[in-house]
């Protein structure tokens, strides 16, 4: 029972993280929609609308410095929230250390109206060269044929799961001890 509970807990925690990322992409997509509508209304030129949308998405942050990125349909970075040096580079062939072609997966999966979740590993930052597990969600914005995405590291997810598992184990142990004590006392009372 405890094993099944732990598997269910892990799946639930992962699903919550996935949904959080999905909702954040929906927010960024709505922001881009605002600028696309301004272009359709004639308030902005197409070029000005695109630049404003990319600047707005690039400036968005959440959680612990997580950011958004925008790719064109071919995999070229058109905006990146933390590394502007990537803008203009085609990352379609990029792979993580395990050989996962994560950008190609995003490009392919983002064609779905629901978007796509991709799992891969990537260095967490300049101070941490070791690749860490990450999940990203990406969705196509049809107006400008952009792929809007963001990824979150899940190393903290593993730590949170271990803490929850230990709490569950502790609770189970207390329940077992109480039931054992009650059974022992009941057995003595009957004899």
Residue ranges and their predicted role:
Residues 10, 15, 183-191:
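Cytoplasmic juxtamembrane amphipathic helix immediately C-terminal to a transmembrane segment
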Residues 7-51, 167:
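Juxtamembrane membrane-water interface segments immediately C-terminal to a transmembrane helix
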Residues 87, 97-163:
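Extracytoplasmic
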Residues 58-77, 114-119:
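Short N-terminal helix-loop-first-beta-strand/juxtamembrane motif that initiates sensory/input modules
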Residues 1-8, 168-186:
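Extreme N-terminal signal-anchor transmembrane helix of membrane signaling/transducer proteins, especially
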Residues 13, 154-175:
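Membrane-interface helix-start motif
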Residues 50-58:
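Short amphipathic alpha-helical segments
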Residues 76-82, 131:
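Amphipathic coiled-coil signal-relay and dimerization helices
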């Amino acid at each position: 029972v405890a094993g099944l509970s732990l598997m269910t807990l892990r799946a639930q925690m992962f699903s919550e993280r996935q949904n959080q990322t999905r909702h954040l992409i929906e927010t960024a997509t709505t922001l881009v929609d605002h600028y696309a509508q301004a272009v359709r209304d004639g308030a902005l030129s197409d070029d000005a609308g695109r630049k404003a949308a990319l600047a707005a998405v690039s400036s968005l942050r959440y959680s612990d410095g997580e950011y958004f990125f925008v790719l064109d349909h071919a995999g070229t970075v058109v905006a990146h929230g933390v590394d502007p040096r990537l803008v203009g580079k085609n990352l379609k062939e990029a792979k993580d250390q395990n050989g996962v072609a994560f950008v190609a997966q995003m490009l392919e999966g983002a064609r779905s109206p629901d978007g796509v979740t991709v799992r891969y590993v990537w260095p967490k930052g300049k101070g941490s060269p070791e690749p860490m597990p990450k999940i990203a969600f990406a969705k196509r914005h049809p107006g400008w044929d952009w792929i809007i995405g963001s990824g979150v590291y899940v190393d903290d997810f593993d730590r949170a799961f271990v803490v929850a598992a230990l709490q569950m184990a502790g609770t189970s142990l207390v329940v077992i001890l109480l039931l054992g004590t009650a059974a022992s006392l009941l057995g003595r009372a009957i004899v």
